[in-house]
């Protein structure tokens, strides 16, 4: 088997040539990791052994004080001028310096990056035929020629140089101005070349190499700790990051263990067992203040045939939602705020209804701490408003057919189309305008009339959460990524923050026991009622298939049989949000509220034109590439023709209402959704 490795030919061109080879670095990091793991285990063991054993996640909480000092940074300490920030479209602000109890300092800038779907293809060859997946063959004409950095809308995966130069551009221009990176997966080529089928080992190798590139690019080279990064990185698992694509079994498995090894420098050590089970974790982006949860969306994904739903207690999606619930409650108890992230967006097109509805409930009932969510997979820049109140209604109706809920309510034609898309994995866009028009009709238009009735502070805005879906690096359209700006003004007023909570390793130790206990009790209860439930379901299935009317009657009967408070006994459903909790950062401008964003893109057609011109002028390949390749501002959230005051939920709901009724605005929105590539169906 051909061993995959980062190509040597053009490494020096990226500005990252000072890195050691991936294999040497891997051995070095493994040795260091073993030492660090041993020391961490020793320290953790002493803490646990001296602590009282807990019977639940919140009883007899152990005190663990961690102190942080916050101070503003003077203008002469700023790493970049206001003029430079303005040229990048960013808002100058006053960074905040955090000093922990050990004296370690970190500067908080109030910005972060969302990047997704790079799909680097090490078999990509410049000047080959696009029709032959950019792997081989002589181009039939200039339109069939594989460009060095890729061709928008042509269907090939990303050239390695596109990934290298993208990260290098971010490193040179933005790495000193962001606090963390949300990286939502798909780091491996598609399985779209029958002559070079993907293998499991190749997928592991590619995930490792891309992870190492992120580590090298954003490492804190002033620190002696190999785990220290200039910015924190929160990766998520993509449906093409596994073998075979889309298929991901309940953990622990070889894949979850191998992925933990690959991402061990991104994942807090206390969460290793959690990752082994769910391939999910979270990171404190700002210690004690702001967290980012990485969800393994493959356990909820319709395209994964190894999982079914989030209703059956044996399903990994159900178990992962238990983890989500306990984790969110702990973050709320600690007074923290949180972003969610994952690869596949949690919408009905992608998720089983029991999964998308339940996740919508958590977004809604924990809206005092959840700011929103970032996802990839779709390759298009757009947003989906998720209605939490509607999710409660959908769940109540679907429970009538127990674990068959959602199955018979699905649009079978839509599922057939989705299945066809899954089989034909690739980068070429197909019927994307049709999809976006569906988003407009299904989401934006349906809320338009309600929005017109709302007052400035109407609580109905709080029924919605926003799912942000990012542009990809792979040239499905033009490559793009986004920088978000968020509120840090209140950090400047806090002299000290004292946290008294159980250590995270203690929390997760007891959480594992708690979840296992819940699962065992639920499975025992199901076994007792299994025979009766099977008879009930068997009698309902023919009615459902014959008539929707009969199905609804069947649902009504089953619902009457159950307690009206059935959701209170199932911990994958959240408790109602206490009425005394104020609106969170997604709804009112406060600490960590998202204020605006800047969308960057690479105009591949113009880059290739400039690159070829420079070659003709006598420049070397590396010189021409360094000059030609660049990202530029595509637009900012406050740009015309639909400038947003902020990027709170209210602003998105009002934008959705505007887009539903204004075709001219919609045309601009579509142009931006397709990253200024000129795409049309």
Swiss-Prot record:
Residue ranges, Vacuolar compartment? 45-681
Transmembrane segment boundaries: 24-44
Major location category of this protein: membrane
Q: Name one GO molecular function term.
A: endopolyphosphatase activity
Q: Sorted alphabetically, which CDD domains does this protein's record hold?
A: MPP_ASMase (cd00842)
Q: How does it sit in the membrane?
A: Single-pass type II membrane protein
Q: Where in the cell is it found?
A: Vacuole membrane
Q: GO terms for CC?
A: fungal-type vacuole; vacuolar membrane
Instruction: Output one GO BP term.
Output: polyphosphate catabolic process
Tell me which EC number(s) this protein carries.
3.6.1.10
Q: Where is this region: Disordered?
A: 549-585
Post-translation changes: Processing by proteases in the vacuole may be required for activation.
Q: Which UniProt keywords apply?
A: Glycoprotein, Hydrolase, Membrane, Signal-anchor, Transmembrane, Transmembrane helix, Vacuole
Q: What EC class is this? A: hydrolase
Q: Which PANTHER family match?
A: ENDOPOLYPHOSPHATASE, SPHINGOMYELIN PHOSPHODIESTERASE
Q: What does this protein do?
A: Catalyzes the hydrolysis of inorganic polyphosphate (polyP) chains of many hundreds of phosphate residues into shorter lengths.
Family the entry assigns? Belongs to the endopolyphosphatase PPN1 family.
Protein name, per record: Endopolyphosphatase
